[in-house]
Structure formats: C-alpha cells, structure tokens
Amino acid sequence: MTASSKTPASSSGPSPHAASAHDKILIVDFGSQVTQLIARRIREEGVYSEIVPFQKAEAAFLEMKPKAVILSGGPASVLDKDAPAAPMSILKAGVPVLGICYGEQTMAQQLGGTVEAGHHREFGRAAIEVTDTCALFEGVWEKGGHYNVWMSHGDRVTKLPDGFRAVAKAQGSPIAVIADDARRFYAMQFHPEVVHTPDGAKLLRNFVRKVAGLTGDWTMRAFREEAIEKIRAQVGKGRVICGLSGGVDSSVAAILIHEAIGEQLTCVFVDHGMLRKDEGKTVVELFRHHYNIPLVHVDASKQFLGELAGVTDPEMKRKTIGRLFIDVFEAEAKKIAALGKGSAEFLAQGTLYPDVIESVSFTGGPSVTIKSHHNVGGLPDRMNMKLVEPLRELFKDEVRALGRELGLPEIFVGRHPFPGPGLAIRCPGEITREKLDILREADAVYIDQIRKAGLYDKIWQAFAVLLPVKTVGVMGDGRTYEYVVGLRAVTSTDGMTADFYAFDATFLGATATSIINEVKGVNRVVYDVTSKPPGTIEWE
C-alpha cells in the first residue's frame, strides 16, 4: 500500500535461489501487460520461469543459463526508431525460443524477415487456420482446423526469415504462426497465455515439453526445502522479526521461516481494529497454539481509530494506517529487544514475485515497480534491518500451494484476498467503531451464506461494504432509518480483470434477509453488478 519510504536496495529485483537447482525458462519482457501470465503458465508445468526486461536479458541469460527463452508481447512497434529487440546473443545461443506477438515480430525482423504496419489493428478474438503441422500443435491443433485465439497487434510479418515456414494464418495475419524446426524457433501473432485463447496453455505446454524437452521438477516441496536452506544461510544465528497481517502471504512466510530457524523468529501481530470477525483470535490460535511460534499480539485499535476519526479520503486512510503501523511495529520491536531477547537484525515480509518484477518504460528507460506494503514499508531503513523475503519468487497461487505443503488449514490457505487497510476501505466515508462492528457482522453473515451454498471456492473475492447512507424501512410495526449494506462478489483468474458473480435471486434474497434480521443497524441490502473494468474490485 502507500505509507512507505523507498524499498531498500536489498529487495530490488529477483534473485532466484532456484537458479542452480532446476531447469529454467527466461522470459524477456517487452512491456506487455500480461507477461506475468506467461510466467504463471510455465510454472504450472513445473518449470521455473523468470521475467526480465529486454535491456537486462543478455546478462540474465548468462547468469541463469536457461534451457529456453520466451519473447513477450509489448506495446512498441518494430518499425519505430530504437525499437526494443532481443539480444542477438540469445538468438545465437542454440536454445529454443518462442516469440509471442511483439516477440514474433522482433524475432522475424532480427533474423532477416520483413514486418510491415497492418491496415488496421487486430484486437480481440480471432480465428486461426492451421496450414501445416509443427511441434507446438502436436495433440492440440490439426492441419486444416480453425481455432479461436486472442489477438492484440497492429504490425504483421509479411516475409519469413530464412529457415522459417508459416504454419497458421488469420484474416488479419497471413503469417500468424511461424516455425524453424531446426533451430527450435517458434513464434505466434496471438497471445497463448491469456484465457481468451482456449488452447493456449496446451500450446505453451508443448513448447516446454516437446520443443524444449523439459520434464518439470520445480515443485513446492522442492521450493520449501531450498527456501529453508537459504533462510538458514542468510540469517545464521541472528534474530528475525516478522509483521503479521493475518493474511496468507505473511502467515506462510512466518511459518516457513520458523521451520528454518525456530525460536530465532518473533512475530508481531498488530490488530488495527479493522480486521474481519474473529480474525485476531484465529491468528493468535494458529501461531501460538498450533505452531508454537513466538507471537506478540498488540491491540492498537483505539490508537488507529482515534487517528482515523474524521478522515474520509481513502488515500488518506491508507497513509494514516501505514504510518501508524510503522510506529506501533517499531515500538514493539524495541520492547522485544528490551526484554533481553536482543535486537532483531532481520525483518521478514511476505513480498511476492509480482511485487519485484521489473517493468519497462520505453521512454525513460527501465524502472523498477515494487509494491509498497502498508504494514512494513520504511521499517528496514528506520530500524537498520536486513530483509528476509522467502516468497519473493512466488505468485499468489504458488504461495497458497506452499501453505498447503506446510500444513496450513485449508480454511486459512484458501481465504479470499483481504486488503492491508482492512475494513477501512470497505466503509466509505468516516470510520467509527460502530460502523466497523456493523460491517464486520454483515460480512460474516454474507461469507457464511456463501460457504453454506458451496460457492466460496468458486469466487475470487467476496465481501460486504457499509455504505455511508441511511434509508427508511419498516420492521415490525415501526419505521426504521438505518444503514445500507452492499454485497460484492467477483470471479477472476488474476485480479487484473474481474466479472461480478451471478448469484441466483433466491440466494441474494435469503442472504439479504439474514443480514437484516441478524445485524442491528441495517435495513437494506444491495448487490454490486459492476465488472472490472470499469470498476475496481474494492470500493476504495
């Protein structure tokens, strides 16, 4: 979230410990918004993949020694002056290469083909006709068949480089898929990584298995063992302090670190008063009693709610919560040191791979985009601590898989995403303890109804929102004037886009009745049917 100073250099960029132990695929990023999906699809095949911007691809290739390379899509045109390009050293290295969209165009041009501007952009669903066989299509597409794909391009390949043949075409792309079987170079004008290309995952699997010959040995069990060794090597006999938010990321990180170094870890759980119902009790029970991990539980709700009184701007809410979290966390760390346990040299946090992937700016050079965490941002600088980030190579779904590998209860591992500022951004307008109590109860009833209906695991995220308005109602023989609760539920694969979940009317009616009957202060319930875009998943 926001309240952070810059992330220290020790966390600026991936540093895979899997590099020496497993086969790897290097993904060269040309700025596509869906490059992360390529990495996820490859990892689903049990092969470690890493994304680097094209400017750093040559150095990364030498360091990683990958068994294959994928060139991503991107917004640029190969016809532009100083257009991004793949290092020729990679194209001459003898490893399989797959080009996707812009990756196809730059591969074709760099190897002697011709790319021209199209008469019109081709964006959205398109039909591919397979004109010849190749390793990518084996067992997936047949010669002469027509298949749906997702296109997003303006330029197109019009002349093949030597050694290539066209194996598929589309209406706007006469050369839609190309193959050089001898060099194991393949490229496609469409995006196989997105769900809108139904057979895309199978095509990528063929590149991994049949073209690159990789079997897939990167598992969460292997990651767990390697991460434990890495933590022990980094920490030695030092002490680690970990800020728990109650979410999956920080919890999995803490349990993994505790498995590595035991009592050298102390966790600090700051309850800011904006958690879900019984969340504080659940965290304390899990860490103190189930895992026997040293835990300091701080109820700072009075302090947080006092500072938030009168604050209505959502960004100011985030900044206030982030600033206070740092203050409280730092104070507790000093108390731990004063008790004779010694000052912690290391700060653990649940940074994930999307937080550290370097993005590319084609006008201003490379820029590192690292998500600031509302709960620990700025602490390493202020407290002179080194970072321990055992999850920084993983995507969210991989963190959940690691949690299961570590034995976390499914009801905890499979929880829907929850924002760092908590219910503060699900309560538009000013926050009060009364409003939070109402929202907490309404949310609990809603989630309980979803679980009873067997829908929880089918939904990406579901929650209640307490609207800053009251409406007139009738309950019994009396008039009421109480709050409105909004219900939100979405389906998504990655959180970047989302559709509202289509509950049936019976479920919505029963849930609304339960909330109104069980939660004092609510007399009306509405359902949010906005997708993302144009809306966001959270209301603030």
UniProtKB/Swiss-Prot annotation:
InterPro entries: Class_I_gatase-like, GATASE, GMP_synth_C, GMP_synth_GATase, GMP_synthase, GMPS_ATP_PPase_dom, NAD/GMP_synthase, Rossmann-like_a/b/a_fold
EC number per UniProt: 6.3.5.2
Catalysis performed (reactions): XMP + L-glutamine + ATP + H2O = GMP + L-glutamate + AMP + diphosphate + 2 H(+)
Keywords, in A-Z order: ATP-binding, Glutamine amidotransferase, GMP biosynthesis, Ligase, Nucleotide-binding, Purine biosynthesis
Domain (GMPS ATP-PPase): residue spans on this chain: 218-415
Coiled coil regions, renumbered to chain: none
Enzyme class per UniProt: ligase
Gene3D superfamilies: 3.30.300.10, 3.40.50.880, HUPs (3.40.50.620)
Known partners and oligomeric status: Homodimer.
Its biological purpose: Catalyzes the synthesis of GMP from XMP.
Protein name, entry field: GMP synthase [glutamine-hydrolyzing]
